[in-house]
C-alpha cells in the first residue's frame, strides 16, 4: 500500500513540476502580448523617426497634388506656411496625439485651416495621399486604422465646404 501512496505523491509532484515549468512560460507569453497591446501608437509607428519619414513624404505629396493646387487658398497658404514648416508642425502633432513625448505648439485645427476653404473632396484627396505615404513605408493596417481614427476627428475643423 505504501507504494500506491507514493505513486499518488509522484503523480501530484509530476503535475506540480509540469505546472512549475509551464506557468512561467505562459506568464511570459502573456506579458509579451500585453506589452505589445499596451505599447503606444507612437512606439508602434517607429517613434519620431518613423513619424517624420512618413510626414515628410505626405507633405511632399500634398504640395505636388494637382487637385489641391487648384484651390487658390491652399496655394496662397503655402507661402505663409512652407513645406518644411508644415512637416515640422505635422510631425510634432502626430508625435503628441500618438502618445509620444512631443508637445504640439501650432495653432488649433479650426483657426489654422479656416482660411484654406478645404472641401470634402480635397479632404478625401489628402486622406488618399496620407494612405499612399503610410503604404509606401509599410505601416501596418492596425496602426493605419488608429491614425485614420485620430485624423478623422479633425475633419469637422478642417473641411469648410461640400
PLM regions: where:
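N-terminal secretory signal peptides that target proteins for export/translocation
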Residues: 1-14
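Hydrophobic alpha-helical segments, especially transmembrane helices
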Residues: 13-17, 145
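Elongated fiber/stalk and passenger scaffolds
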Residues: 14, 32-36
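Bacterial N-terminal signal peptides
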Residues: 17-30
Amino acid at each position: 500500500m505504501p507504494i500506491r501512496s507514493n505513486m499518488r505523491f509522484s503523480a501530484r509532484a509530476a503535475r506540480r513540476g509540469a505546472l512549475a515549468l509551464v506557468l512561467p512560460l505562459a506568464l511570459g507569453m502573456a506579458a509579451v502580448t500585453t506589452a505589445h497591446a499596451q505599447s503606444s501608437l507612437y512606439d508602434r509607428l517607429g517613434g519620431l523617426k518613423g513619424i517624420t519619414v512618413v510626414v515628410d513624404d505626405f507633405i511632399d505629396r500634398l504640395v505636388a497634388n494637382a487637385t489641391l493646387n487648384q484651390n487658390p487658398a491652399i496655394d496662397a497658404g503655402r507661402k505663409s506656411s512652407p513645406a518644411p514648416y508644415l512637416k515640422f508642425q505635422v510631425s510634432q502633432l502626430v508625435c503628441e496625439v500618438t502618445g509620444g513625448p512631443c508637445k504640439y505648439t501650432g495653432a488649433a485645427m479650426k483657426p489654422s485651416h479656416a482660411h484654406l476653404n478645404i472641401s470634402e473632396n480635397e479632404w478625401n484627396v489628402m486622406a488618399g495621399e496620407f494612405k499612399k505615404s503610410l503604404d509606401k513605408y509599410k505601416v501596418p493596417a492596425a496602426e493605419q486604422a488608429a491614425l485614420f481614427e485620430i485624423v478623422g476627428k479633425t475633419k469637422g475643423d478642417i473641411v469648410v465646404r461640400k
